[in-house]
Swiss-Prot record:
Residues binding substrate: 21-23, 36, 59-62, 119, 156
Subcellular location: Cytoplasm
One GO process term, biological-process aspect: gluconeogenesis
Protein name: Phosphoglycerate kinase
The organism's place on the tree of life at top rank: Bacteria
Subunit comment: Monomer.
Classification via PANTHER family: PHOSPHOGLYCERATE KINASE, PHOSPHOGLYCERATE KINASE 1, CHLOROPLASTIC-RELATED
Main location per the UniProt record: cytoplasm
Pathway: Carbohydrate degradation; glycolysis; pyruvate from D-glyceraldehyde 3-phosphate: step 2/5
Amino acid sequence: MAKKIVSDLDLKGKTVIVRADFNVPLKDGEITNDNRIVQALPTIQYIIEQGGKIVLFSHLGKVKEESDKAKLTLRPVAEDLSKKLDKEVVFVPETRGEKLEAAIKDLKEGDVLLVENTRYEDLDGKKESKNDPELGKYWASLGDVFVNDAFGTAHREHASNVGISTHLETAAGFLMDKEIKFIGGVVNDPHKPVVAILGGAKVSDKINVIKNLVNIADKIIIGGGMAYTFLKAQGKEIGISLLEEDKIDFAKDLLEKHGDKIVLPVDTKVAKEFSNDAKITVVPSDSIPADQEGMDIGPNTVKLFADELEGAHTVVWNGPMGVFEFSNFAQGTIGVCKAIANLKDAITIIGGGDSAAAAISLGFENDFTHISTGGGASLEYLEGKELPGIKAINNK
């Protein structure tokens, strides 16, 4: 069933509560990556154009004690948003009370207000994170309609998403709608053939994704640290590479049942240490020396993976191919980025988290159909789970 989106709502003169995802990295009070703010702009600008009065909610980090408040205030976000919108953004350094209510009452059509970090409410019994019903009801009372544009928290049942949805007509923002369309589309209505590329450190993080995608994808390419558990399951020598002993049986079982779909590395860049100065050797993936650790996929594997991607109509990628934070172990991830970017007529999706960070930091931001803003949310969506934040959005 299609979900309501913000453009389905009558917004003129309405106080519109918008749950955005402004959980941005900060260093000394400065925003170091504004991607999440940029992604929220289309929804905010649309509501301004339609004459809505916007009340923005977001969390930022984890507020565990009183001393966390000062460094996790959303004030820098309000300032950045004001510059991007080229208009004043009223910032209220509170999450409830008369001051907030009065500021909302003063809003005119097209005005924008940002409420303080919703997780300030976690100091007193985790009211935000545990979806305290009274808090959700109170926040809902501050507006007329609710727009959820925070895909990054869609897998969480919090007061500021599901709690507010319980009491107000709820629609998806444009970003949330995009995530439902692309990430949800892979799971529910994929354009075949589908190739999934899975990387990152651990098999355990991706088990449920693999279990779900193996029934959807035509091929599953496995790289990154998790590949070594699969190579070990085939009886290959992996040296001191990352290994999850307790996942070898899972890998064996998967290879027995779906070996024709699974593509593993054929060569590996190995070294003795995580360093840009480390001595690197490229060796076949079945004979990694006993004192060496696999750090990245090798050049033959990059070519193999690129060949396997040819002809795909949908590609979904989650997890880097190597320790990309070190430039000498980033070539595998760069090679896969290039191979995906070169595909013609394919829907290409990065499922958030480290692979999204890698693609953006390596300069491939504009070469994919969609780069998800959700880490855990993307993974759980790819597992085939119904996410509470999406479930709470009204159907059309």
